[in-house]
């Protein structure tokens, strides 16, 4: 019978690499993507590695309720709560998109107690690039 091959870096040898929740993050970047159908809030560290994220869909909102301001407020609160436990005190906010959840998400971020260094609108605007899709006829 053949000898078993010893595994290098198995779970028995202990954890390799750092766990996400173990990091202390004093400063981060909060990205809010607000479309008409959903609002996604992603919290990253300064280097751009994702620490936490939430969306209106993951908070339990379905259908047209995902695009509401209340759903965006709930999603922002969920994403920020986890990073506050990891020690985040200061943040920059980048808001993208035309959705209804823009202001509600920003209001929830302000209420959370984080010190905001700046709030920037990074919505992509064409310099007359591609032709837009035809208008809807309902």
Curated annotation (Swiss-Prot):
GO terms for cellular component: chloroplast; ribonucleoprotein complex; ribosome. InterPro entries: Ribosomal_uS11, Ribosomal_uS11_bac-type, Ribosomal_uS11_CS, Ribosomal_uS11_sf. It comes from the Eukaryota. Part of the 30S ribosomal subunit. Residues 1-23 are annotated as: Disordered. GO terms for molecular function: rRNA binding; structural constituent of ribosome. One of its GO terms (biological process) is translation. The gene is rps11. Keywords: Chloroplast, Plastid, Ribonucleoprotein, Ribosomal protein, RNA-binding, rRNA-binding. HAMAP family: Ribosomal_uS11 (MF_01310). Pfam families: Ribosomal_S11 (PF00411). Belongs to the universal ribosomal protein uS11 family. This is Small ribosomal subunit protein uS11c. It is found in: Plastid, Chloroplast. Residues 9-23 have a biased composition (Basic residues). The keyword Cytoplasm does not apply.
């Amino acid at each position: 019978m053949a000898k078993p091959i010893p595994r290098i870096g198995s779970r028995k040898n202990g954890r390799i690499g750092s766990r996400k929740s173990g990091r202390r993050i004093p400063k981060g970047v909060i990205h809010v993507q607000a479309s008409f159908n959903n609002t996604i809030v992603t919290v990253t560290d300064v280097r751009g590695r994702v620490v936490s994220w939430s969306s209106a869909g993951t908070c339990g909102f379905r259908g047209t309720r995902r695009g509401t301001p209340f759903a965006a407020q709930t999603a922002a609160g969920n994403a920020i709560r986890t990073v506050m436990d990891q020690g985040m005190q200061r943040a920059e906010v980048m808001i993208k998109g035309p959705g209804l959840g823009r202001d509600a998400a920003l209001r929830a971020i302000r209420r959370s107690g984080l010190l905001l260094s700046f709030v920037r609108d990074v919505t992509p605007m064409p310099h007359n690039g591609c032709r837009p899709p035809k208008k809807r006829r309902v």
